[in-house]
Amino acid sequence: PSAKGDDKFITTDYLQQCLCSRSFGERITDKDAMHQAVVQYAERAAEKLRGERQYCRQVTTFVRTSPFAVKEPCYSNAAVEKLPLPTQDSRDIIAAACRALNHVWREGYRYMKAGVMLADFTPSGIAQPGLFDEIQPRKNSEKLMKTLDELNQSGKGKVWFAGRGTAPEWQMKREMLSPAYTTRWTDLPVAQL
């Protein structure tokens, strides 16, 4: 196949990785606060994954301090959790992300960023389990996740997992957020005479 416009050109127009990461408004030094952040990022990554109609078999959690902080120790690490079955269930992805966090968390650092990345995708959740595997897919998982996404469709964060917390202090600062002129009526500029 050639890239000169003929219809046999092969493209990869499907998702290969899904990442949700943020820099924190306040540095995190507490593992519970980091756990809340990782749950929120895993939840959002799973939502994106379902939007692409994909299933994942790998969850990576990473944390890092600021490489530019003077007189502070620098630390960055990531851990990968392989899933026994492909999933798009937020519960499975959150659990894997939190297990990975336990591997990379180190006390004594002021973390400035964390994230969750999903990879090793398959377009369906069908997998051949081993003959003696005890792990089976969750019943009604797709229905539950579809309902969750429908409830959250009219606005992010209407329904969330408890591990995410209710009012995290570490959230991104949004004072300098650009106005959303094309998507939010309240941000439209008003002309006055």
Predicted segments — roles?
Residues P1-G108:
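DNA-contacting surface of Y-family translesion DNA polymerases
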Residues Y75, L83-L193:
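Acidic, metal-coordinating catalytic segment for phosphate/diphosphate chemistry
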